[in-house]
From Swiss-Prot:
Membership in a protein family: Belongs to the MgpC family.
Organism: Mycoplasma pneumoniae (strain ATCC 29342 / M129 / Subtype 1) (Mycoplasmoides pneumoniae)
Basic and acidic residues: bias regions: 218-229
Entry superkingdom: Bacteria
Region spans: Disordered: 168-193, 215-267
Chain intervals with Polar residues compositional bias: 170-184, 248-267
Identification of the protein by name: Putative MgpC-like protein MPN_149
């Protein structure tokens, strides 16, 4: 991959982040500049002065980071060493060649730089160290016609290639018709960017649609998930009322981050379902969405933070959530130490396996962009450490799921092996704590 970066004349700071084989003939790689760093302000610090917690929540903490943002937004495609303004991230696509080699085919520039939380200038001076945003692991801003695009997965499910759906003679102007023919969700046109503009504004995700919904931040139509005409004052008011800003209280955050579903579907959907390919919420017996909280919030929308959790962008700490340490079990060997609160709590437990041969819970009932589920989660050696994710009441974990912690920490692009049981998770001799 270093050779590929050299050939493409990318800055020497570029590094390989992720890669994936696509069939036998394609190799897709994601590269980013190590100079691009990000820092967060979630509005919980004492000096926030009651400002809108969603304004300027994300900022780039180096000049190169800001250049990457400005360069990608300006549409500059010059990646030569002479132009240091461009530090955008790229999807690189390679074609298989004889003698087990890969030949560069094309690159796709991401709308915003791929960034991840790192220690850097300004990080040590922030007063909200250890807050929710410091747990951000990955930020992948997607664009159409990449293996990471939601519609790519939906199109494949329905037997159509992504480029066939998005592009072709007259298809851009007849997007609604094409979308309907391929039985895709109510997604925006082919030019819309599918990532959040995290550095400003407020964004929402509609629960019954597979694509994020954005509040338009300027006069442009493309690039906000919905055309401006579709985001009227009525929808904005409804979204703001249904998905209020979260940050004033940790307990409120805890109550809404894992959207409560009716029935027995109480797994960590926001953590386990790390794909925007399929984002259909389970319905209850009456046919409603079955979403929301006891105060009737988050019935139709998720705000920026919750939407990012659903998309798998923000990966919570394996020990804490929203900074409310007292509510979370930090002792892997103490399975009875759950939240004293009567409200459901998200709990994390370390578990060292004696065996891992349970049927895999089918979180995804169709192909997803980078997840391939085995029939059984064989292949993990005895003693492999897992993390149990589930809701906790009193002395048990309901609908516990097992996930290798190094997979969890890397986020949705790497989450390949999930073990679980279809019934209530019971601790017994076979399931031993570390």
């Amino acid at each position: 991959m270093a050779v590929g970066i050299f050939i493409l004349s990318l800055n020497p700071s570029y590094e390989l982040v992720d890669w994936k084989r696509v069939g036998d003939t394609k190799l897709v790689a994601l590269v980013r500049s190590a100079l691009v760093r990000v820092k967060f302000n979630d509005g919980t610090s004492s000096d926030s002065n009651n400002q809108d917690t969603n304004q300027n929540a994300l900022s780039f903490d180096t000049q190169e980071s800001q250049k990457a943002l400005n360069g990608s937004q300006s549409g500059s495609s010059d990646t030569s060493g002479s132009n240091s303004q461009d530090f955008a991230s790229y999807i690189l696509i390679f074609q298989a060649a004889p003698r087990a080699t890969w030949v560069f085919e094309r690159k796709i520039k991401l709308e915003l730089p791929y960034v991840k939380n790192e220690s850097g200038a300004g990080d040590s001076t922030t007063t909200n160290s250890g807050s929710l945003y410091t747990t951000l692991q990955d930020l992948l801003v997607e664009q159409p016609v990449t293996p990471y695009t939601p519609n790519a997965g939906l199109a494949r499910v329905n037997g159509a290639a992504q480029d066939t759906v998005h592009f072709g003679s007259g298809q851009e102007s007849s997007w609604n018709s094409q979308r309907s023919q391929k039985v895709l969700k109510n997604n925006p046109g082919p030019k819309a960017v599918t990532g959040f503009k995290l550095d400003k504004g407020r964004a929402y995700r509609k629960l019954n649609e597979a694509w994020p919904v954005y509040e338009p931040l300027d006069s442009t139509k493309d690039g906000k998930g919905k055309d401006e005409s579709s985001w009227n004052s009525s929808e904005k008011t409804t979204a703001e009322s249904d998905a209020p800003l979260v940050g004033s209280t940790g307990s409120q955050m805890a109550a809404v981050t894992d959207s409560q579903q009716s029935g027995d579907n109480n797994g960590l959907v926001s953590l386990a379902q790390r794909s925007t390919t399929v984002a259909v919420q389970k319905s209850d017996s009456s046919g409603s969405q079955g979403q929301g909280t006891t105060d009737n919030k988050f019935q139709k929308y998720l705000n920026t933070t919750q939407a990012l959790h659903q998309m798998g962008v923000i990966v919570p700490s394996l020990e804490t959530w929203a900074g409310e340490n007292k509510y979370w079990n930090r002792y892997p060997c103490c399975w009875w130490c759950f939240s004293p609160s009567s409200d459901p709590a998200i709990v994390f437990h370390k578990w060292r396996s004696t065996e891992c041969n349970h049927p895999v819970i089918p979180y995804f009932n169709r192909p997803t962009r980078l997840l391939k589920w085995p029939d059984r989660c064989d292949g993990f050696e005895r003693g492999t450490e897992f993390v149990v994710l589930g809701r906790g009441w009193a002395n048990h974990v309901r609908k516990g799921y097992l996930m290798s912690p190094h997979r969890v920490e890397l986020g949705h692009r790497q989450a390949e092996g999930v073990c679980g049981e279809s019934a209530w998770f019971q601790w017994n001799q076979r399931h031993r704590l570390a």
